[in-house]
């Protein structure tokens, strides 16, 4: 389905919907136009984590998911499916989680694990 909403309400709705897949840190985003498309993490980067010295704990799954969406949109469905499957395998196995705290995996460890699943 397609919803057309003002930015504020779209933001609220996507935040709530993202909770079904693990939170806003796991959601990719697609902005599709007639001629152009842009893919990104649902809420962009994590500058507050950088300011607090916790940048290595930023969760990269939203950017990885956006990358899979870009692959799909660009006609690389097989590669997109493999990337989506790697994300799902990582989530299902719960081997590595990025918590934003020192007790979780770093973004690099998580990304390496995703790459090993490809």
What is each PLM-predicted segment?
Residues 1-82, 86-94:
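Glycine-rich phosphate/nucleotide-binding loop
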Residues 77, 82, 86-118:
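Glycine-rich phosphate/pyrophosphate-binding loop and the adjoining helix
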């Amino acid at each position: 389905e397609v919803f057309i909403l003002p930015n504020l309400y779209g933001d609220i709705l996507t935040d709530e919907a993202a909770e079904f897949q693990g939170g806003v840190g796991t959601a990719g985003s697609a902005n599709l136009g007639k001629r152009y498309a842009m893919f990104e993490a649902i809420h962009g980067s994590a500058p507050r984590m950088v300011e607090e010295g916790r940048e290595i704990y930023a969760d990269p799954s939203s950017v990885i998911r956006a990358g899979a969406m870009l692959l799909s949109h660009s006609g690389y469905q097989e590669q997109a499916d493999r990337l989506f499957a790697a994300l799902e395998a990582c989530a299902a196995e719960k081997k590595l989680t990025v918590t934003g705290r020192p007790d979780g995996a770093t973004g690099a460890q998580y990304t390496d694990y995703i790459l090993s699943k490809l």
